[in-house]
């Protein structure tokens, strides 16, 4: 049996990435303060349809993701369909796979096209760190349920007497893993220590990311893939990412204190992604349908793979496990790629994965391979800057990476590109695209 992955429909047509778009990414409580993930999702899908001049009624499926979900609208995908002029009968459902969420939505739509169930679909994701589901304590939640059942005033009074002042305080969304209690930052610290990744190297990668992202915005390359977002009360707008350090100076990174291990740590706010608001989306079609409608796709999906590893150690090493699977399914080696886009959750996590890509020992012991995945050529790596600069709205990053690498390959005359990311829960994803 062949290891090659057939990312085609029954007619042998490839899965075309017709267009992609995102909002600017904004740091928490700045430009998108008070704007929900749902509103950002509707905003970007509406604009994507308008720019591509695609009739919303032609969309047969929309798969959309959100990591920090709002109880008021648990199926963000369905609400986007209802808010963007698509047929009410359009199939829509929501997914979540932590930081790999919009990779998952893209794969789900692609697989619907591969099976012949649809020919046109939209995938993407949105997250807001500014509009959050603030919860209540377990004791207060328990008491509120009991209050709903209580009949007399006396019964209600007895329930209230069980509560202390602390029980009445709001509870923000958890930032730690449910199964381990470890935060992403703590895991990044562990990886930095395990693989001897210095503070200087982390700061240098962050500086590189900000410098390249600033240069990319100055070049105008992102103008066609980032919309201008007008936000309520519509007296202001945001037209570019606001986390990027313009005129980044390497020496300034050393001034920040460690964020997670105050005494011996090396992970800081400057070499980590900030909490970010934003949304992104892509249009996928069968190759034949895209041609029939007169579109010139920005790329095609060549292969993809997901991975899962232990959550106690090296939880953010997902790219090192998913990438060799995607390469094998594409019939490629790392050196065959034109560009590599790796999600930079933390500089420490990114550098640890780069180190494992080049490690024969890791390949033999963890992957069952007799050779390393390969040494990453930095002239191919995150050439426009990465998440450390752009920011990371959890569910939006995947389709941001896909669009960005496809459009950059197009500017360079074509080729193949790897997009890969780690995700909470020990998850990983890799997708290879080809561009003509």
Swiss-Prot record:
GO molecular function term, any single one: acetyl-CoA C-acyltransferase activity
Segment forming the signal sequence: none
Cellular component GO terms held in the UniProt record: cytosol
Record key words, sorted: Acyltransferase, Cytoplasm, Fatty acid metabolism, Lipid degradation, Lipid metabolism, Transferase
Record-listed E.C. numbers: 2.3.1.16
Pathway named in the protein's UniProt entry: Lipid metabolism; fatty acid beta-oxidation
SUPFAM superfamilies, per database record: Thiolase-like
Reactions performed catalytically: an acyl-CoA + acetyl-CoA = a 3-oxoacyl-CoA + CoA
GO biological process, one term: fatty acid beta-oxidation
Active site: 99 (acyl-thioester intermediate), 392 (proton acceptor), 422 (proton acceptor)
Major location (coarse): cytoplasm
Subunit and partners: Heterotetramer of two alpha chains (FadJ) and two beta chains (FadI).
Family of this protein: Belongs to the thiolase-like superfamily. Thiolase family.
Function of the protein: Catalyzes the final step of fatty acid oxidation in which acetyl-CoA is released and the CoA ester of a fatty acid two carbons shorter is formed.
Protein name: 3-ketoacyl-CoA thiolase
Encoding gene per record: fadI
